[in-house]
Amino acid sequence: MDKTIDDIDFEKSGGLVPVIVQDANTKEVLTLAYSNRESLELAKKTRKSWFYSRSRNKLWMKGEESGNTQEIKEILVDCDSDAIIYLVEPSGPACHTGERVCFHNELK
């Protein structure tokens, strides 16, 4: 079933929805971020990974500073319309630390 931005339940979590970013080819999870309506609209329009920074309270595009952009190939919405997956082709590391993925620390 196809969904539109109007179907997304932004209010469930205070205006934001979690976005899982996944490599479109390998299906590896690259990172988890959050989007508000405006950043999701930008992502859909530009096909680049846009998010809302909870710490800086502003929109940001992955790679705007590092150059490590992510081209969105597909946007998927979960069954409750309160979480999203961006399937992307990354141009470099996903993590701000320079690691390929953000999930590189094992919980012991």
Swiss-Prot record:
Question: What broad class of enzyme is this?
Answer: hydrolase
GO CC term (a single one): cytoplasm
Q: What is its EC number?
A: 3.5.4.19
Between which residues do disulfide bridges form?
none
Q: Which GO terms describe its molecular function?
A: magnesium ion binding; phosphoribosyl-AMP cyclohydrolase activity; zinc ion binding
The entry's localization annotation reads: Cytoplasm
Q: What positions does the entry give for Mg(2+) binding?
A: 78, 80, 82
**For this chain's UniProt record, which GO biological process terms are given?**
L-histidine biosynthetic process
Which metal ions or organic cofactors does this protein require, according to UniProt?
A: Mg(2+); Zn(2+)
Tell me the first and last residues of the signal peptide.
Answer: none
Annotated keywords: Amino-acid biosynthesis, Cytoplasm, Histidine biosynthesis, Hydrolase, Magnesium, Metal-binding, Zinc
Q: How does it assemble?
A: Homodimer.
Protein name per the record: Phosphoribosyl-AMP cyclohydrolase
Q: Which organism is it from?
A: Nitrosopumilus maritimus (strain SCM1)
Quick one: which gene encodes this? hisI
